[in-house]
Design a protein with these regions (language model features):
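Preference for intrinsically disordered or flexible, low-complexity segments
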Residues: 1-184
């Protein structure tokens, strides 16, 4: 089972604590100043929003999951910074991506809507198995599959394939999540 993600551009007065790609991240106060200069905000997921679809309880059902990207290597060498916070965020960081060269335009928020889908469906989604896995070995466990052509966000729209965020050996260790760019 996988959790599909559909996105729509957020209205001006949206809830900053909503599940979304880009826009203003809302984070714990303790994280203030805890980001690198080359880091951009990709998404935040309010885990209560996905609880009814995560029947295997692979993710927590409270708090927030965040994905930031280190961009020092450019579009073709991104690195994931995946974080979990168990409570409610207290700090909104406006224009998070504005100072990162090449990513200044990714400040508009795109709200996420979740639905249950088949494991291998080719779209932006959580969990399941990676689409287009062309290798003989068993694929790593998937946290997030991002399909740049699945929306009008414009992020990495030159990538004809997927960004995969794979769990490490321990799904509870989000610091071990790896990012793989896969071209079709």
């Amino acid at each position: 089972m996988a959790i599909g993600i559909k996105v729509k551009k957020a209205p001006a007065d949206y809830d900053l604590g909503a599940s979304k790609f880009f826009g203003t991240p809302t984070v714990p106060l303790a994280w203030e100043g805890d980001f690198y200069e080359d880091e951009i905000f990709l998404c935040q997921i309010k885990l209560a929003d996905i609880a009814k679809f995560d029947r295997e309880n692979r993710l927590p059902h409270t708090g927030y999951l965040y994905i930031f990207l280190h961009t020092d290597g450019g579009d073709y060498d991104l690195e994931a910074d995946v974080r979990y916070f168990y409570g409610e965020p207290e700090l909104a960081i406006d224009d998070f991506n504005l100072e990162v060269e090449g990513y200044e335009g990714f400040n508009d928020a795109y709200l996420m809507e979740f639905c249950e889908i088949n494991d291998g469906e080719a779209c932006t989604r959580l969990l399941g198995v990676p689409s287009d896995w062309n290798y003989e070995d068993t694929p790593p466990k998937l946290l997030l599959q991002f399909d740049p052509l699945d929306s009008e966000m414009g992020f990495l729209d030159h990538l004809d394939g997927f960004l995969y965020f794979f769990f490490g050996k321990d799904e509870n260790d989000l610091e071990s999540v790896t990012l793989v760019e896969e071209y079709s």
